[in-house]
């Protein structure tokens, strides 16, 4: 009776306390709802140097048809000189993704004989070497053979597909993408490809067009040009039906699907790209830093999808080969100075708020590390998405069965965003509050469903209050944890946070202590 009287007296005086400002807004809400108010706040400083290797963010290195088992050593990828050669690093210590430019013929030269199933094949060993170095895969499969080798397996031609010879090499054949036999065979291949590689643990993205010159979605040669839109719908439908879990990307080229490679933007291009995006595609571009090719149309298209889709960057100039990059209209690139191009690519990537940048291969990757290593580290620090909790408020004493509040604020240090809004991810990454017992067992998890990671962009932090029910917990000492979990994997940590490594436990960030009394 005495306890009831005291509680009744306190509730009678609550309006007075609130009116006088003696109770915080959060405490007011907590007391009125039966949730225990906060007791302690911890502030976090971000880790701005560690390479996190989260999905769909960070550096991408390239591999292609020239790979062999000695590649990592002979091309110095396992010991790449930096800063003029005063030390070396592994390229894979900075690249989280390895993008493999490959062709259909290399993957299935004989119908139904898929090279990724053959442990003795060069491609199988290539893929294994990438995974051994802690990188995810990405793919573009080319079918057009012009300027390259035989990219489509000849069994397609033998089955009756119509096509054309490379004018510069009549021994090389390519199929018309509007040919029914080609489409039937390619659909079968892509379905098998997806069975093996529609796995986000192994694959970061699929460059899901692959038609035209170099697979870049321009210079497409049809049997009948009137089939252009029909072919675009067919290829994007085929990829979207095959790949459900791995993000698909397409080059936002001003002449996407057209027969020419450069001109004023085609009136169809924006509409076609929007059709692909509606099917779940995200976007990339293959000419960053080429200011005569990456112009206002491209900038406007990227701006329209800023923080709505992740943007993947590829530089356009090949600085160590035949490209005369010093004639770029910007006038900023000096002959013999690859580092000028690297800076131009970096600036344009920052302006576009890209999530991923390319190291590519050859002189590109060598110059990124040798003369522009500061930019490699800078992008890790300020590009893509880089998430961490700025502060967490929690109770440090409670009773079993009580409901307590945890207040948590989040920040993205990167100029990009965490694309939990794309259909392949379906919001699978969430904030989670957890409790760990004295034996390091996770005994309680509570998702912060209201927290949308895709809304955390520079200048717009996330602020949330999550209620945790302590029902079922025994008397004892516990540790508050917070993390970014993968809800498709029993809410285990799925994204790495930019916090001090000393605060981490199996991907969770340790926040503070909680003592539970019965």
Where are these regions (language model features)?
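Aromatic-lined substrate-binding rim segments of carbohydrate-active enzymes
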Residues: 84-166, 226-247
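Conserved, mostly hydrophobic/aromatic
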Residues: 98, 193, 206, 239, ...
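Active-site groove signature of glycoside hydrolases
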Residues: 163-225
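Extracellular/luminal regions of secreted and cell-surface proteins that mediate adhesion/ECM remodeling
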Residues: 380-518
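Catalytic cores of secreted or luminal carbohydrate-active enzymes
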Residues: 341-394
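Catalytic-core regions of glycoside hydrolase
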Residues: 32-82, 94, 131, 207-215, ...
């Amino acid at each position: 009776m005495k306890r009831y009287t005291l509680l009744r007296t306190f509730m009678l005086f609550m309006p007075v306390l609130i009116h006088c400002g003696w109770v915080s807004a959060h405490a007011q809400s907590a007391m009125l709802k039966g949730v225990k108010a906060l007791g302690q706040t911890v502030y976090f400083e971000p880790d701005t140097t560690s390479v996190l290797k989260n999905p769909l963010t960070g550096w991408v290195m390239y591999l292609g048809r020239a790979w062999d088992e000695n590649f990592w050593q002979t091309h110095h990828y396992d010991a790449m000189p930096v800063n003029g050669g005063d030390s070396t690093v592994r390229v894979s210590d900075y690249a989280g993704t390895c993008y493999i430019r490959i062709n259909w013929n290399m993957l299935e030269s004989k119908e139904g004989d898929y090279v990724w199933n053959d442990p003795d094949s060069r491609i199988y060993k290539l893929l294994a070497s990438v995974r051994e170095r802690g990188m995810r895969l990405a793919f573009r499969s080319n079918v057009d053979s012009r300027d390259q080798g035989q990219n489509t397996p000849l069994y397609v031609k033998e089955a009756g597909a119509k096509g054309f010879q490379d004018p510069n090499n009549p021994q090389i054949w390519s199929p018309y993408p509007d040919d029914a036999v080609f489409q039937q065979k390619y659909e079968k291949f892509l379905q098998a490809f997806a069975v093996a590689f529609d796995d986000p643990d192994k694959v970061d993205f699929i460059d899901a067009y692959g038609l035209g010159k170099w697979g870049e979605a321009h210079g497409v040669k049809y049997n009948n040009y009137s089939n252009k839109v029909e072919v675009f719908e067919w290829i994007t439908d085929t990829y979207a039906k095959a790949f459900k879990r791995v993000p698909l990307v397409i080059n936002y080229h001003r002449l996407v699907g057209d027969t020419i490679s450069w001109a004023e933007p085609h009136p169809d291009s924006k509409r076609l790209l929007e059709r692909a995006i509606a099917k779940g595609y995200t976007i990339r571009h293959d000419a960053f830093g080429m200011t005569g090719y990456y112009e206002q149309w491209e900038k406007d298209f990227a701006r329209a999808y800023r923080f709505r889709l992740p943007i993947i960057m590829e530089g356009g100039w090949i600085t160590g080969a035949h490209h005369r990059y010093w004639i770029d209209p910007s006038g900023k690139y000096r002959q013999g100075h690859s580092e000028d191009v690297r800076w131009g690519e970096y600036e344009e990537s920052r302006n576009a708020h890209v999530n991923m940048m390319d190291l590519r291969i050859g002189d590109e990757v060598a110059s990124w590390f040798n003369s522009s290593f500061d930019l490699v580290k800078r992008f890790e620090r300020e590009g893509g998405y880089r998430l961490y909790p700025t502060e967490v408020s929690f109770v440090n004493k409670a009773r079993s069965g009580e409901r307590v509040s945890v207040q948590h604020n989040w920040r993205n240090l990167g100029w990009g965003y965490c694309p939990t809004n794309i259909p392949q991810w379906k919001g699978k990454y969430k904030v989670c509050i957890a409790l760990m017992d004295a034996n390091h067992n996770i005994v309680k998890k509570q998702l912060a469903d209201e927290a949308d990671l895709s809304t955390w962009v520079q200048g717009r932090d996330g602020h949330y209050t999550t209620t945790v029910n302590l029902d079922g917990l025994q008397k004892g000492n516990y540790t508050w944890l917070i993390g970014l979990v993968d809800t498709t994997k029993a809410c285990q940590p799925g994204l790495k946070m930019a916090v001090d490594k000393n605060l981490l436990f199996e991907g969770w960030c340790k926040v503070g202590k909680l003592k539970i009394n019965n």
